[in-house]
């Protein structure tokens, strides 16, 4: 990494990194191979060892030096002897090497940024559960939210022209762009092998959109935003700041039109493609931002994005579906007794409270899709391998149950998870009974329901049962919301399909 960093410092021109010469360096493909990018190329029934893999890379680099293969049309490349043999293999090597190369400057910027802000253990700040305390502190005072699904890009701009020609070359040679953007089961092997490059291109599109959006938000808000990019350890992408004011208005009309969307209190959060824009403004104000974003995508990114894909919802009467939770702002009534001299009276106060619930119906649909139950929520048995032991089966079901309890530990009403635990518990019992060719009742009678419940006990239940006698302060642990710092991705069963 030090050698790459020295090269980039020497070859940097106008703050843009020209990565084209790195394609001809052998150590780049070695790094890509060591990081697991090329594992699928060498290890799937090809019989290549490390020595022969290095020889293939050397031969590829030698042939790239001999001829200019990056400006060839698709028809000419079909007649080129360079691609006549091992065409797919060479294309995969270049594509995966390219995926590693384009991440180098952004990784270096991320490391230097973390060192500059003296953030040592930033991995503890990656938890997606850290979003919900932010929502609790801010969303209870807001009125409307925009539910936004960020569209896929039609094209992605790369400032390095030489690398852009290379990217265009192997994309034309290896697959079509539509299958890359919307990979299917029967798509080309590019989308299956090199998902890292696809994610890099899409994230670069999203980060360019967000960099411009944050700039516009800062211009229209009295509050200065705090970047969460370092806290989430995202790769930084720097757009062209000098063209931000020309997104869809001219420089002359920029400040004149910006007052239409000015708001002193706005908040923006995103996870993957789902983003939320919340404000204290009115419905008319949110409609202005909706039109603003649609025009922004159409003019700056050449994307057709229908306005009906952005939903305007009021927090007081709508539940926000985000990160596997149903979040809403509800009124929490409280009665206060006040007494002045001989007169006593009651005061009714309604306090806004941010509430997080478990979406039971979508979660049951996810369990039904995973064959734990039917569409009505009735538990069913799962076919298992005959060589699995009973303890292994119980441990697998228990792990699923504990992971769900761990992820939904921030729910305001944890009793709603009892139905999910019941489905998993009975599905496990039916699976074991099917294996032993017995009935569920007979199997539970022989095994003992206490043993099965011990495996399916959630983390909070274990904590309460272990320390309940030692401390009375833990008695409310089952009713309190707990946010963990070790959850960096959404649970697979909780990642059900939303209305988008």
UniProtKB/Swiss-Prot annotation:
GO biological process: mRNA processing; RNA splicing; tRNA processing
Location (main, coarse): plastid
Keywords assigned: Chloroplast, mRNA processing, Plastid, RNA-binding, tRNA processing
Compartments where found: Plastid, Chloroplast
Pfam families reported for this sequence: Intron_maturas2 (PF01348), MatK_N (PF01824)
Keyword field contains Protease: no
Listed GO MF terms: RNA binding
Coiled coil region boundaries: none
A single cellular component GO annotation: chloroplast
Family: Belongs to the intron maturase 2 family. MatK subfamily.
Function of the protein: Usually encoded in the trnK tRNA gene intron. Probably assists in splicing its own and other chloroplast group II introns.
UniProt protein name: Maturase K
Organism field: Proboscidea louisianica
Encoding gene (name): matK
């Amino acid at each position: 990494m030090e050698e790459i960093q020295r090269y980039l410092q020497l070859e940097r021109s106008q703050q843009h990194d020209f990565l084209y010469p790195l394609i001809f360096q052998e150590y780049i493909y070695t790094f890509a191979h060591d990081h697991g990018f090329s594992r699928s190329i060498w290890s799937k029934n090809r019989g290549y060892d490390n020595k022969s893999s290095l020889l293939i890379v050397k031969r590829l680099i030698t042939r790239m030096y001999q001829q200019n293969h990056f400006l060839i049309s698709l028809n000419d490349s079909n007649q080129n002897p360079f691609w006549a043999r091992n065409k797919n293999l060479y294309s995969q090597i270049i594509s995966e090497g390219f995926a590693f190369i384009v991440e180098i400057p952004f990784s270096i910027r991320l490391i230097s940024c973390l060192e500059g802000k003296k953030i040592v253990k930033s991995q503890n700040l990656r938890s997606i559960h850290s979003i919900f305390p932010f929502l609790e502190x801010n969303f209870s005072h807001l009125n409307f939210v925009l539910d936004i699904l960020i569209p896929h890009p039609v094209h992605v701009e790369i400032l390095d022209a030489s690398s852009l020609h290379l990217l265009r070359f192997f994309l034309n040679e290896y697959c079509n762009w539509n299958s890359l953007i919307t990979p299917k089961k029967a798509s080309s092997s590019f989308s299956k092998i090199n998902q890292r490059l696809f994610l890099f291109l899409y994230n670069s599109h999203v980060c360019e959109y967000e960099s411009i959006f944050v700039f516009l938000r800062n211009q229209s808000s009295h509050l200065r935003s705090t970047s969460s990019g370092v806290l989430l350890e995202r790769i930084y992408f720097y757009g062209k700041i000098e063209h931000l004011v020309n997104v869809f208005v001219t420089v002359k009309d920029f400040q004149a039109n910006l007052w239409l969307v000015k708001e002193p209190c706005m908040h923006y959060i995103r996870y993957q493609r789902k983003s939320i824009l919340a404000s204290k403004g009115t419905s008319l104000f949110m409609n202005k931002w909706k039109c603003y974003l649609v025009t922004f995508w159409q003019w700056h990114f050449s994307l057709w994005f229908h306005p009906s894909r952005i939903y305007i919802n009021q927090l007081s009467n709508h539940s926000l579906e985000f990160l596997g939770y149903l979040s809403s702002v509800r009124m929490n009534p409280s009665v206060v007794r006040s007494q002045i001299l001989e007169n006593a009276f009651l005061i009714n106060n309604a306090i806004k409270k941010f509430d997080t619930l478990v979406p039971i119906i979508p979660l049951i649909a996810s369990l039904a899709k995973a064959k734990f139950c039917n569409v009505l929520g009735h538990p069913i048995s799962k076919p298992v391998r005959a060589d699995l032991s009973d303890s292994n089966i119980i441990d697998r079901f228990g792990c699923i149950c504990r992971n769900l309890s761990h992820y939904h530990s921030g729910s305001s009403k944890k009793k709603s998870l009892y139905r999910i635990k019941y489905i998993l518990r009975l599905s496990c019992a039916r699976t074991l009974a099917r294996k032993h060719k017995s009935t569920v009742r007979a199997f539970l009678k022989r095994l003992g329901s206490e043993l099965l419940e011990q495996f399916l006990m959630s983390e909070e239940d274990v904590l309460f049962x272990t320390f309940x006698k030692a401390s009375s302060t833990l008695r409310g642990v089952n009713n309190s919301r707990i946010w963990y710092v070790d959850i960096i991705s959404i649970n697979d069963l909780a990642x059900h399909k939303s209305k988008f």
